Every structure is written in C-alpha cells, then in structure tokens.
C-alpha cells in the first residue's frame, strides 16, 4: 500500500507517519491512528480467497485490479474508512461476540469465498453501511452482499433467519431496508471462478460499464492502459 500525500507524492506507510506534509494535513495523533496496521503484508495462500464484497461489486474488473495493483489511499479516504469502522464498533459493542463480526467461509475446489457478517441477532442478518447520503433504496451490491452472507450460512442456520436487513448510517440519521432472503451461492461461485481464471491468465475480466466508472480509482488502467482487453 502507498499513501497519497497532500503534496501529490506517494509514500510508504512508515514514511507517511513522519511526513511534514501529511502532518500538516492531519494532526499526528489522528494520522498515526489512521495508518495503524496499514503496512500489513498479504500472506500467500494455497488457493485464492475472495471476499463476498469483491464478488458482488458492480464490476469484476475493479475487483481484479484491487488484487493485482498496489493500493493507493489518500488521507481523506483513510479517514472515511476509519470513521466507518468506529461507527460499526459503536453499534455492535453491546452484542455478544457470537452475534457480531461472524466469520464465514465456503470452500470450493480452486478458491474459497469468505466474509464477515456485521451482526446476526435473533432471526436477522444485518449489514451496516456508513454513508454521507442515505439512498431511497438499498444499493444492489449492498443487498447482494447481505444475501451472499445469508447464502453461505449452514442450512440449519439459514432456517433460523427470517430477515436480511441493510442498515445505512449517516452522521444525521439511520435508515433500514429489508431485502429478500435468497440463495445467491451459484452467482458467487461463478464470479469467483471468472476472477480466478482472469488472475491465472493475468488478463482483466470484461469491463462492466456503469455509473461507478467515473468514480473508479482504476479508470485510467481500465479505459486506457488495458483498453485492448475489451
């Protein structure tokens, strides 16, 4: 991972901790908290493991780039991530450990699919999303992410779940949406297989053009450097 400095330079995490320009933008105590753990190195695995969120992303090519390209984050984005994490912790702090941050894993021959359920209390699976603007309806990939977690539960666990809810949290309000219970495991498997094939061939999957393109951090790679792969 590289940190994009306010000066425009790209820094290693350790250097960013003492960078004068980074310190000028974010006070030292906050900066060090933002950078904590950001220099972790990925450990090689025998077979790839994909998060549910990466498989239900609007564009599988973006998920491919997130694996193959070095991650670059600016301080504003780091603050957004950290704020979201803090809100998640606040919401779930009174839940028993067995009802929050529940790790799930589905093994396939060539890959695994993994995820963390934000909360699963009584008969409901909850997925929390922090946002500046609360939508009028749940975004499709957020609904799919929650449904994906439900799909990966053991049959006896699924039988106990009557509701799946996506909860949007802004600094001003909270809004809850219920999404249908449905099994999307075949979709997750197909997307993971496609991503595995693309990674093995070192060729990006087909571009999935949509509204997200103009906000994508990999726009230049996708539409310029790799346009020959369309």
Kindly give the residue locations of the regions a language model identified:
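Metal-dependent nuclease catalytic cores that hydrolyze phosphodiester bonds in DNA/RNA
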Residues: 1-124, 132-134, 138-140
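Metal-dependent nuclease catalytic regions and adjoining charged, substrate-binding loops involved
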Residues: 2-27, 109-112, 138-139, 152-230
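A residue-level signal for conserved active-site and pocket-lining positions in enzyme catalytic cores
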Residues: 59, 149, 216
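Short amphipathic alpha-helical face segments that pack within enzyme cores
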Residues: 86, 90, 144-152
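Generic alpha-helical hydrophobic packing signal
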Residues: 101-105, 146, 162-163
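Acidic active-site catalytic centers that drive phospho-/nucleotidyl reactions
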Residues: 118, 127, 145
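Residue-level recognition of conserved beta-strand positions in structured domain cores
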Residues: 128-130, 168
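A broad detector of the eukaryotic-type serine/threonine protein kinase catalytic domain
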Residues: 130-133, 200
């Amino acid at each position: 991972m590289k940190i994009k400095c306010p000066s425009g330079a790209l820094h290693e995490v350790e250097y960013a901790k003492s960078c004068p320009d980074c310190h000028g933008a974010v006070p030292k105590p906050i900066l060090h908290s933002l950078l904590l753990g950001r220099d972790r190195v990925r450990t090689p695995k025998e077979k790839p493991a994909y998060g549910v969120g990466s498989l239900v992303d609007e564009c599988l090519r973006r998920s491919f780039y997130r694996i193959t390209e070095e991650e670059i984050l600016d301080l504003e984005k780091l603050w957004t991530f950290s704020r979201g994490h803090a809100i998640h912790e606040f919401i779930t702090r009174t839940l028993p450990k067995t009802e929050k941050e529940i790790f799930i894993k589905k093994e396939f021959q060539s890959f695994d699919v993994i995820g963390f359920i934000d909360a699963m209390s009584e008969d409901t699976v909850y997925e929390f999303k922090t946002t500046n603007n609360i939508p009028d309806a749940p975004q499709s990939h957020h609904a799919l992410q929650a449904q994906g977690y439900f799909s990966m539960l053991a049959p006896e666990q699924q039988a106990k779940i009557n509701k799946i809810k996506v909860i949007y949290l802004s600094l001003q309000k909270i809004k809850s949406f219920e999404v249908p219970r449905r099994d999307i495991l075949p979709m997750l498997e197909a997307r993971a297989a496609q991503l595995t094939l693309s990674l093995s061939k070192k060729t990006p999957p087909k571009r999935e053009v949509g509204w997200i393109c103009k906000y994508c951090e990999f726009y230049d790679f996708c539409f310029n450097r790799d346009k020959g792969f369309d």
